[in-house]
Structure formats: C-alpha cells, structure tokens
From Swiss-Prot:
Species whose genome carries this gene: Mycobacterium ulcerans (strain Agy99)
Gene designation per UniProt: proS
Domain-related comment: Consists of three domains: the N-terminal catalytic domain, the editing domain and the C-terminal anticodon-binding domain.
Protein's UniProt name: Proline--tRNA ligase
Function per UniProt: Catalyzes the attachment of proline to tRNA(Pro) in a two-step reaction: proline is first activated by ATP to form Pro-AMP and then transferred to the acceptor end of tRNA(Pro). As ProRS can inadvertently accommodate and process non-cognate amino acids such as alanine and cysteine, to avoid such errors it has two additional distinct editing activities against alanine. One activity is designated as 'pretransfer' editing and involves the tRNA(Pro)-independent hydrolysis of activated Ala-AMP.
Alphabetical keyword list: Aminoacyl-tRNA synthetase, ATP-binding, Cytoplasm, Ligase, Nucleotide-binding, Protein biosynthesis
C-alpha cells in the first residue's frame, strides 16, 4: 500500500498544544494522530487510527492463539443486570447514566462482566461446552472527574476485555496462566517496557489479581519492587513485613502524663523529648488513631478507627482498597461533636474499646510493642502502652503509606518505588458474577455446577499513548515496526523530475514486496519534509535527495539514529526490504 502525503488527511503542528501535559499528548496532537473534541474525548485521525488498528491486530492474534473467540456487545447497556450485582450503585458518579424516552435507565458501558455472564448462561448448559474464552474490543465510558494526559486518562477509550468460563478452579487457573503468557507476548511484540505486579481487584471482585504496568515517570500508579528477589506489587497490594512479637513480661506499666496542648504528632514528640523519659522519642514511637465512618453497600454508617505508627500517613488508595466495597469518610468536627468520648488529638485505644468502636491496627503494631498514644482526655497521653497487654484490636489493615526502603514482604531486601501506567489487569474472579446470575450448567454427574470466571483487560487506546511515552525523542515519535502506521517513510527531497519519478517507482516496488509506504510527494522544502518525517516517527526513512544523481539514496533508522547509503539499482527495493526486516 502506498499513501501519498499530498492526499493524506494530515496537518502537523510546530508548537505544543497549550493544555498538553505529557510528551505523548503533545506529540500525538502535533503529529496529527489525534485531535481533542472535548474534555477527555478525542478523534482518531488516519495515522492514529492505523496505529490503533495495528495494536488491535496484535491483540487479536494472541487472543485467538489461546482459543479466544471474539464477540461484540453494545456500549449502551440496560440498568437491570448492574442492579443485580449492585454495581449500578457501586460505580457512583464514575459512569454515564441516561434515560430513554420511556424513562428506562441505561448506562454507557464501563465494563461488561454482567453481559458476558448472562450471554454464556443463555447459550450453554453442559460441562461439555467448557472451557470457554470470549473477548471483545470495545469502546468503554467512564465519567472521569479530571480527564488528563490526553488518551492516557480519557472518558471514552478502547479496551480489550476477555472472560474465561470454567467448571472448576483448575480450569480457571489454566485460563489465567494462558492469558498471563498471552499478555506478555502482546506487550513484548509492542516493545513496551512493563512490570507485572500483584494487585487488588477493587469493584471487579475476585481473588488473584495482577496488573501489567508500563514503566513511566508520568504514570499515576505507584508500585514497588525488590531488586534482590524480583517481588513487585502495586502500592495498594503491598503486604507489610510484619515484625516478630516482643516479650511482654517485665515491661513497665503504662503511665498517663499531662502533656499540655499536644494534639499533633509533632507536638507530642516535642513534649516527650523534653519530659525526661530516659530515651529519645521519634514519631515512630507514637500511635495515632484515625477515625472514619464506613458504609457497606446498602448498609448503615458505622465508626471505624485505624491505629498506625505516628511517622506514617494513611494512604487513601491503600485504605480504599482495604475497605472495598465499603465507602468511607473521615470524621469532621460535627461528627466528633456527636461522640464525646472521642477527644480529637488525644484518642487512645481505651475509649475505642469501651464504646465498641471497631478498631484495626497497622501490622507493625505487634504484641509486646510499646507506644505513646492518647489517653482520651484533653492534654493527656499515655506512655508505655503495650500491645497485647494493655490493648487489643479487631484485626489488622493495610492502610499506611509504603515508603522507599521499607523491607520487602519476602524478606529478600528493601523496596524501591517506581511509577507506571496500567496497561493490563488480570483477575481470577471466581463465582462473584455467576453467583449473582445463577449461571449453572449440568456437570458430568448430572448435577448443577456453578461456573467460575476470569476477567482480563487491556487498555488498547491507552497503549498508543504508552508506546509514544516510551518511544520518542526530542525530534518526535518513534514507532516500533509492529504497529507503525507505515513501514517506510519515503521522502522526495529532490525537485529533479528524474529523481521524483525514481522515488515513485521505488515506492511501487516496495509496495510489491509487501512494505507499506508513506510517500512524501508534497511540494514542500526538504527541511519541512525532514522535520515531519522525524515527528511522525515511522521506523525507517528513505530519502531520495541530491544523492540520486550519484546513484545513492539514504536509509535512516528512526530508532537507532544510524544513516547509511544504498546504491540505486535493480535490487534497491529488495535491499531496503531486507534491511528493515532484519
């Protein structure tokens, strides 16, 4: 295929868009791949659509290779299935809802678990029909509060979502493993630098869960890794390395002190270091108790207290993941006024336990550890309160912030922080959705068997931006050959009629060899053409310029930056095709 730039619907820009924040956003707009039409909404122009379709092709090839069958659901979905799973409520303001002219409720699909489950239930009824994997590549919609970074976080986006259906956990594990390997092949073919991290399932439900994160400084996801062992996890899924318990016998009794106006950790530590306690005190020696209200879906608000070492803050992403699907709100002054036993700035475990407030502790607060914490009276704290002797909790919770240098959960070394962009997520859903819809089939013994599911997503349109983030330089984009809009960008940089005719002939020969060619036949200066070639980012650039008269053309490697001369002759097209395929 030959596409002439004189006929291509394309306009490049020399300046960055004023509202573009990240390199991919700037370059994709400047190079004419996408255009904004509203907050979080983008049109795909010819070059951008070719990249998107090439990524879809790679995904389809690998999904088909593991036995996936492609289907397509509507994007406009009725309310009823999402009411059955309670996700009509759980999604809150994050989805687009609408009514038809008869007052019936719909949403623009953010995800399709319900539809996949109902479809399989309606079509199959025997164990002989399984295992089964279905997938779709479909536009999704989410009402992002703050769309940002171009197509990295948009309101309308393309996803591949697949679902495996099996009659037992062994089949689910096999499907999960097959998808995991397929995803690795997909991202390797796309030349994405990524890491696989342990993750949490969130509103999707399920048990085992892993994310594929593309390494990027502009990523919104924080993850950690241990260099020594290879352990990696999304920050929400990090399990705190729990210290060993300490002996309780022989520890001094807890003592209540008048500490004055010390409602913050900083003021409490300052008091402690002036009080003659016989040791230097840091924030890590204090225990702060954070109060909130939580509500399970369909339930009532109830109090929850979380105790964390005073040198740690609550990480709201980790907190939300730990409490999911419950929602939470930190107590405000009006709330504290309703519970006089909660003395703001001086809350301790005693009042919490006496008033039946659910109390969860950070895993570092193990039996035998001694703490300075609130004494439930204004201006008073207790020193030497020992966990397991003076107070207990209802359990532990992973809600405190994770830090660079924290010990890895596997004990192999320290954690290193990094940032990434989520490009894929795989879940072992189990029976959450098949339970909701009673998706049973007849087993080998003639008795009903409840199907078990896996869910596997890839952000297809997001991958365009991710690859642009990872593969660009100060001149422009640099697309991997697998998904580039064209294999060769052929630039006519010579006004001579013979050179122009030779370039057009060369394009035809390359086309005959199966090479897709973008032919710059515009009446523009060589400088303009070269700048556009660098900006557009085809992996190979062939220049028919002044050297044509001497029997040579230039072949430029956009990835490696090398340039070499090739001799004009009968084998020129073959030589170029061999070079770009090698």
């Amino acid at each position: 295929m030959i596409t002439r730039m004189s006929e291509l619907f394309l306009r490049t820009l020399r300046d960055d868009p004023a509202d573009a924040e990240v390199p991919s956003h700037k370059l994709l707009i400047r190079a004419g791949y996408i255009r904004p039409v509203g907050p979080g909404l983008y049109s795909w122009l010819p070059l951008g659509l070719r990249v998107l379709r090439n990524i879809e092709r790679v995904i389809r090839e690998e999904m088909n290779a593991i036995g996936g069958q492609e289907i397509l659901f509507p994007a406009l979905l009725p309310r009823a299935p999402y009411e059955t799973t309670n996700r009509w409520t759980e999604y809150g303001d994050g989805v687009f809802r609408l009514e038809d002219r008869r007052g019936n409720d719909y949403l623009l699909g953010p995800t399709h678990e319900e539809l996949f489950t109902l479809t399989v239930k309606g079509e199959y009824n025997s164990y002989k029909d399984f295992p089964l994997t279905l997938y779709q590549i479909q536009i999704k919609y989410r009402d992002e509060a703050r769309p940002r970074a171009g197509i990295l976080r948009a309101r309308e986006f393309v996803m591949k979502d697949s679902y495996s259906f099996d009659i037992d956990s062994g089949g689910l594990k096999a499907a999960y493993h097959a998808h995991r390997e397929a995803y690795q092949r997909i991202f390797d073919r796309l030349r994405v630098r990524y890491v696989i991290v342990s993750a949490v399932s969130g509103a999707m439900g399920g048990s085992a869960s892993e994310e594929f994160l593309a390494e990027s400084p502009v990523g919104e996801d924080t993850f950690v890794r241990c260099v020594e062992s290879g352990y990696a996890a999304n920050v929400e899924a990090v399990v705190t390395a729990r210290p060993e318990s300490l002996p309780i016998d022989g520890q001094p009794d807890a003592v209540v002190h008048d500490t004055g106006e010390t409602p913050t950790i900083a003021t409490l530590v300052a008091w402690a270091n002036e009080a003659g306690l016989g040791r230097e005190v840091s924030a890590a020696d204090t225990l702060k108790n954070v109060l909130m209200k939580i509500r399970q879906p369909g339930g009532e608000w109830e109090l929850l207290a979380i105790g964390v070492p005073g040198d740690r803050e609550i990480d709201e992403k980790r907190l939300a993941a730990a409490l999911d699907p419950a929602e939470y709100v930190f107590l405000d002054d009006d709330d504290f006024g309703k519970y006089p036993f909660l003395v703001k700035g001086y809350i301790g475990p005693k009042a919490l336990r006496s008033n039946d407030v659910r109390y969860l502790l950070d895993p570092r607060v193990v039996d035998g550890t001694s703490w300075i914490t609130g004494a439930d009276e204004p201006g008073r704290h207790v020193v030497g309160l020992v966990a397991g002797r003076d107070f207990t909790a209802d359990g532990t919770i992973e809600a405190a912030e994770v830090r660079e240098g924290d010990p890895a959960p596997d004990g192999a070394g320290q954690l290193v922080m990094a940032r990434g962009i989520e490009i894929g997520h795989i879940f072992q859903l189990g029976r959450k959705y098949t339970d909701a819809f009673t998706a049973d089939v007849l087993g080998e013994d003639g008795k009903p068997v409840r199907l078990t599911m896996g869910s596997y997503g890839i952000g297809v349109s997001r991958l365009v931006a991710v690859i642009a983030e990872q593969h660009h330089d100060n001149l422009g984009l640099r697309w991997p050959a697998e998904i580039a809009p064209f294999g060769v960008h052929l630039v006519i940089a010579n006004k001579d009629a013979e050179a122009r005719a030779g370039a057009i002939g060369l394009a035809g020969e390359l086309d005959g060899l199966g090479v897709e060619v973008l032919l710059d036949d515009r009446q523009a200066s060589p400088g303009v053409k070269f700048k556009d070639a660098e900006l557009l980012g085809m992996p190979w650039v062939v220049v028919v310029g002044r050297g044509w008269a001497d029997g040579v053309v230039e072949l430029r490697d956009r990835f490696g930056g090398q340039t070499r001369e090739l001799t004009v002759g009968d084998s020129l097209a073959t030589d170029i095709a061999a070079a770009i395929s090698g």
